[in-house]
Design a protein with these regions (language model features):
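Carboxylate-rich, polar loop motifs that coordinate divalent cations or form catalytic acidic clusters
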Residues: 1-236
Length: 236
């Protein structure tokens, strides 16, 4: 009787294993290397993002690429096309919603609309004076999905979705901002060229920043990558 029970149990285990094995094999991660030989516009990649539609966006030194798992679609500047991206050097890609992406370039930030596949460029005071530095346009997004943009030598801006334009945010920031991040509580951390970390609280409704104190570390900061739940600072 005991032997029969063991045989029956073993039969059930084999049956379950046989049913699950194909699914387990199918679920294994697949690593695939992609390059300009596969349609990528340039092998020098500056940024990438997987959006809510599972499209992989890749920003390079020569164009923005959308990869659907099979092929690339490349977006490049075309002076004859008013709906093209403003510049081919891509630095940041941010998803505001499932239909809107924001892309920062060496000359302007761009709002891309999925339904039209068109870009709307915003130059924020640099139309007649293109920036001479790389990464002059820095993008961030708040918990309420508001787009924030810092432009070197121009200041800090917030995009007004109703008016479809950027409005200036009152601030006392220095001129040497290198980068910034916004956390889940809408606290903004600005990194200066001297490695100083500045902490502000953002209030979009009042179009202003409120400076916080007591958060500057006693050592210079050079990079501060952010995850969904934490901010990591790296110094000397």
């Amino acid at each position: 009787m005991i032997l029969r029970k063991h045989s029956y149990f073993r039969y059930i285990c084999i049956l379950i294993y046989s049913c699950l094995m194909p699914a387990l094999l199918h679920s294994q991660n697949v690593v695939k290397q992609i390059s300009n030989a596969d349609g990528l516009s340039n092998n020098s990649v500056n940024c990438f993002l997987e959006d809510s539609e599972h499209t992989l966006w890749v920003g390079t030194w020569d164009g923005l690429n959308a990869y659907n798992g099979r092929s690339f679609k490349t977006y490049s500047y075309n002076k004859k096309d008013a709906g093209s991206i403003s510049n081919n050097v891509i630095w940041q890609i941010i998803e505001q919603s499932d239909s809107i992406l924001w892309v920062s370039t060496d000359y302007g930030v761009n709002r891309w609309k999925r339904s039209t596949q068109q870009f709307t460029p915003y130059y924020l005071g640099t139309q007649n004076n293109p920036p001479k530095q790389e990464k002059s346009f820095l993008l961030g997004i708040t918990s309420g999905k508001h787009i924030i943009c810092y432009v070197k030598e121009q200041g800090l801006f917030c995009f007004d979705d109703r008016r479809q334009e950027f409005v200036s945010l009152k601030n006392d920031l220095p001129d040497d901002i290198r980068n910034f991040v916004i956390d889940s509580k809408d606290r903004i951390f600005f990194l200066t060229g001297h490695g100083q970390l500045l902490h502000y609280q953002l209030t979009v409704r009042n179009s202003c920043l409120k400076k916080k104190s007591g958060t500057v570390p006693p050592f210079p900061i050079f990079i501060f990558p952010r995850t969904a739940s934490s901010l990591t600072m790296t110094g000397r």
